Amino acid sequence: YINEIEWYRDWQLQSPLIIKKSRHGAGSKLPYNEMPIGKLIRSSSVSPKHGGFLYRLAKWLNAKYILELGTSVGISTMYLSGAQPHAKIVSLEGDCQRALPTGLDRLPTLDMVFFDGNHSAEPTLRYFKQCLGHIHNNTAFVFDDIRWSNEMYRAWQVIAQHSSVTVSIDLFSLGVVLF
């Protein structure tokens, strides 16, 4: 399945389609409002290495209920659904502050959450706290781009030291917490 995802990524990298970007959260470090889908994939999508990590973690967790904050073009969603084809996945793109309560209502619990929708500390911490009410002892949260900025790294440190967290793993650009 991973080979199919990477074939799709390669195919989309060549696409002439232009995507209109909307700004949510800290946004992108790229100044463009419109860009070719290939450029968006290169700048915003999960890498093959991190996609493989998400795939293996979802499989290992046997995750049935997965929440993703920050869909972009859906590459990470494909890794998650490939690992767990029968899982219920809610993937949010855009204004997560408005969409998160509805997304949480659609899942009875959270087995895995991938946070990649905002690179600002305050919203990231708020989303983390909102999701805490839906965890169990085998839930895993994965945070992308924990070193995207000093602010994001400080948010990661607060999350890693939260009293509900039993294990935190700093993978430099990804952070994982277990409960």
Predicted regions: what is each one?
Residues 1-114, 118-142, 146-178:
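A short alpha-helical cap/connector motif
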